[in-house]
């Protein structure tokens, strides 16, 4: 029986809830072509995890949650889509985005914040778009090598979810299934992705949420710092 992970209670109330989904299933052929092209560059662990998701049939992923904390969806602020149609926002009030949908986008936002701080420190005022776009958008980023490091549990979010988001902004699929570029400055996909197996410690993997591992305060104490 389902039960609360917090209290253990089986007094569960089932509620209906409307959510937004990232249509990952549409991108499976494009992702497979991209990932297969990285076999000689990425560790086998990474490509095998990514291709396993595709081989099992890529499912659309819910990208909103009913939580009090998170990046708000704010659907009432949305404008029309590229075809001019307004989205159906009924039932989306109070939703927040799923963390692994919005967190990788922050990689781009962090670059903008860095570029802005650099420009202000240099006395040039706020950053210009090209100051941060040259790291993320083609053709300005043609000379950039983009590398990610992560544990194996985060590989799917960076080989499937985030690439789907970027490809979906860069390209459009026609009714006949063909894709065409619609973004004059397409977002750059990761070049090198290094995924690693978990490090076990006292019978389980290192985990911040479970407080298992050697953390900075403990490391400093061991070093006598």
Model region roles, listed by residue range:
Residues 2-225:
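Structured secondary-structure scaffolds
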């Amino acid at each position: 029986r389902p039960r609360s992970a917090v209290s253990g209670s089986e007094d569960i109330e089932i509620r209906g809830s409307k959510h937004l989904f990232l249509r990952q299933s549409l991108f499976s052929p494009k992702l497979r072509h991209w990932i297969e092209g990285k076999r000689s560059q990425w560790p086998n662990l990474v490509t095998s995890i990514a291709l396993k998701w595709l081989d099992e049939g890529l499912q659309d992923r819910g990208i909103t949650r009913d939580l009090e904390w998170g990046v708000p969806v704010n659907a009432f602020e949305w404008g029309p889509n590229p075809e001019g149609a307004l989205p159906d926002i009924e039932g989306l009030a109070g939703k927040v985005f799923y963390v692994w949908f919005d967190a990788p986008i922050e990689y781009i936002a962090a670059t903008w914040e860095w570029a802005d701080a650099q420009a202000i420190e240099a006395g040039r005022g706020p950053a210009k778009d090209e100051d941060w776009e040259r790291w993320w958008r083609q053709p300005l980023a043609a000379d950039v090598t983009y590398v990610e490091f992560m544990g194996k549990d985060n590989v799917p979010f960076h080989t499937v979810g985030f690439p789907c988001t970027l490809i979906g902004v860069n390209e459009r699929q026609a009714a006949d299934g063909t894709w065409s570029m619609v973004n004059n400055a397409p977002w750059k996909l990761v070049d090198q992705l290094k995924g690693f197996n978990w490090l076990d410690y006292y019978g389980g993997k290192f985990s911040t949420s479970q407080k298992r591992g050697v953390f900075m305060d403990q490391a400093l104490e061991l070093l006598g710092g």
